Structures are given as C-alpha cells and as structure tokens.
C-alpha cells in the first residue's frame, strides 16, 4: 500500500464560539487562537495518547475493553488512518481516526468483545435493528469499524481531512489486495442529553416545570459532524452505557448551566457506497466561513 504524504493545515481557529452561530460579536465571545495542525500516520509513540482518546470515546464502558490491545491494533496498520498533532511528530495526538475490519480480526479477544458489546447494544434499540442483524451473522460481515475521537477543544475542521485521507488509503489498500473491501461502515461516537440537576432538586427553591414523561429528549452532539453523517446512514441510534456514572457526574459537567448532562453512546451504520457522499456533505458543513 502506497504511503500517504504528510500534510499540513495552517491557521485553524481553535477555541471560542462557533463562527456559524449567530450572536453578539463582542471581544468576549471571540476567543480565537491560530494553531498549526499536522496530520501523521499512527506511530508507536502514539500508544498512550491513543489509549486516552479511546477511553474518552467509550466513556464509562471503556473499562470493558482491553484498550492496550485496541491501541496496538491501530498501530499495527500505520498506513491506514491519521493522528493530528500540534507540536510535531514526537508530541501526543490531539485527534485520531482509523478503521478496523471486524471480519478480519473477529478472532482477536478485543474485537470479539467489541462485536458482542455492539450487538447487545444494537439489539436494545429498535432503530439499530439492521446493525443488530449484521452483527449476529456468523461470520460477521466485512464491516469497517471507524473509531475517531479528539480532545474536547479541538475544532471540527480537523475532521474532514482525516476522512478524505482514510478513503484514499482504503482505495490504495484494495488495489494492493489488502482486506479493506467493506460491505458497511460503523462509526462509534457519543452524544449527550440535558438532565435535571440533582443539586437543584435537593434545593428548597421552586423548581422549573419538569417535562412530561412522553416528551422527546433533545439530543446534543459532541461531534457536530455527526448530525450530517446521520442523514446518510442505513440506521443510527443512541445506546446507554453499561456502567453508569455516579449521581453527581452530570452536575460535575454542568459548568454554570442550570442543567447537567448525561452522555450516551452513538452508533451509525453506513452502506459502504454511502459514506463518501456523507463525507462530502460534512466537508461543506464544516468549511470555515470566509
């Protein structure tokens, strides 16, 4: 498989408010730092950084999986996938994206655990029935499991180049007869919903009127690109984590807001020929304003 060239993107705006959101344009709102981002192939030096990002991706359920083994699998295919760094090749990755062939690695313990976990979670959400059916097959189909995560303050604009390079690398791998001809892609992500603060509930002050039990809970995205990607999926849905956070966890993420947040997993299944169109729309959505 041909080696991808290292690329560099200058002056990406990092931090502050999203420039696409209407609002006051005061100096207080415009906290912008220009940062040079560099894209690299996964390397052994990234091992611990990848583990940290993988734990962040799987949240409270990260303890279920052997994250060291999963990191090693990512590093074992160095010409597929990317990391994003800001302080040169020797620094820790601030973001990563890769794909793993579930069929090719089905006998490896960490992939067995992942397939079993994803199948159970998909079967618990009717919206994910097509995914549950695929993961129940023996052997599992050639599904490309896309894993991607970034530090919380990383701009979404670093994501499209990673997907673009991944699609190129997969095409090169297929030309070289490597096992990356996928029938589907499955992206693991996260979202969150707002919940009533436990601290406020214990307070004696009058409370805001609660939503009726039948009201639909609004979903928010940690990764804004997920809102675009979902439109191109065969199916998508949220999953509850097996290991629950303690009751005070949502308040610890409240940050001066009236409501806390509860995180959920998110699964997005694509027919293989639909992902490229999703990536193209995502690029347009995340294109920095002129």
Swiss-Prot record:
Where is it localised? Cytoplasm; Nucleus
Which superkingdom, per the lineage? Answer: Eukaryota
Q: Which GO terms describe its cellular component?
A: cytoplasm; nucleus
What range does the record give for the signal peptide?
none
Which regions are flagged for Basic and acidic residues bias? Answer: 1-11
Alphabetically list the UniProt keywords: Cytoplasm, Nucleus, Protein transport, Transport
- Which parts of the sequence are annotated with region: Disordered? 1-27
Which InterPro entries does the record associate with it?
Answer: BCP1_family
Where this protein primarily resides, as one coarse class?
cytoplasm
Report if keyword Nucleus is assigned: yes
* Coiled coil, from the record: none
Query: Which GO BP terms, alphabetically?
Result: protein transport
Q: PANTHER family, from UniProt? A: BRCA2 AND CDKN1A INTERACTING PROTEIN, BRCA2 AND CDKN1A-INTERACTING PROTEIN
- Family indicated by similarity: Belongs to the BCP1 family.
User: What is the annotated role of this protein in its UniProt record?
Assistant: Involved in nuclear export, actin cytoskeleton organization and vesicular transport.
Name recorded for this polypeptide: Protein bcp1
Species source reads Aspergillus oryzae (strain ATCC 42149 / RIB 40)
Which gene codes for it?
bcp1
């Amino acid at each position: 498989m041909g080696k991808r060239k290292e690329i560099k993107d200058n002056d990406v705006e990092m931090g502050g408010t999203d420039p696409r959101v209407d609002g006051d344009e005061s100096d207080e709102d415009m906290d912008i730092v220009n940062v040079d981002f560099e894209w690299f192939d996964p390397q052994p030096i990234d091992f611990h950084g990848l583990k940290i990002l993988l734990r962040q991706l799987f949240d409270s359920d990260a303890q279920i999986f052997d994250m060291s083994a999963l990191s090693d699998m990512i590093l074992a295919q160095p010409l597929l996938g990317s990391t994003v760094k800001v302080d040169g090749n020797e620094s820790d990755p601030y973001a990563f994206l890769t794909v793993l062939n579930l069929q090719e690695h089905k006998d490896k313990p960490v992939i067995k655990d992942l397939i079993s976990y994803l199948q159970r979670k998909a079967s618990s959400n009717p919206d994910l029935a097509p995914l549950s059916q695929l993961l129940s097959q023996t052997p599992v189909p050639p599904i490309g499991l896309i894993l991607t995560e970034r530090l919380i303050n990383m701009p979404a604009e670093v994501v499209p180049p990673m997907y673009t390079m991944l699609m190129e690398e997969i095409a090169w791998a297929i030309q070289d007869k490597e096992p990356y001809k996928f029938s589907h892609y499955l992206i693991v992500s996260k979202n969150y919903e707002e919940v009533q603060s436990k601290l406020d509930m214990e307070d004696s002050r009058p409370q805001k009127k609660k939503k009726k039990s039948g009201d639909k809970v609004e979903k928010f995205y940690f990764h804004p690109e997920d809102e675009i990607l979902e439109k191109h999926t065969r199916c998508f849905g949220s999953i509850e984590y097996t290991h629950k956070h303690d009751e005070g966890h949502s308040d610890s993420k409240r940050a001066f807001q009236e409501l806390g947040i509860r995180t959920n997993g998110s699964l997005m299944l694509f027919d293989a020929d639909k992902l490229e169109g999703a990536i193209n729309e995502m690029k347009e959505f995340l294109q920095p304003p002129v």
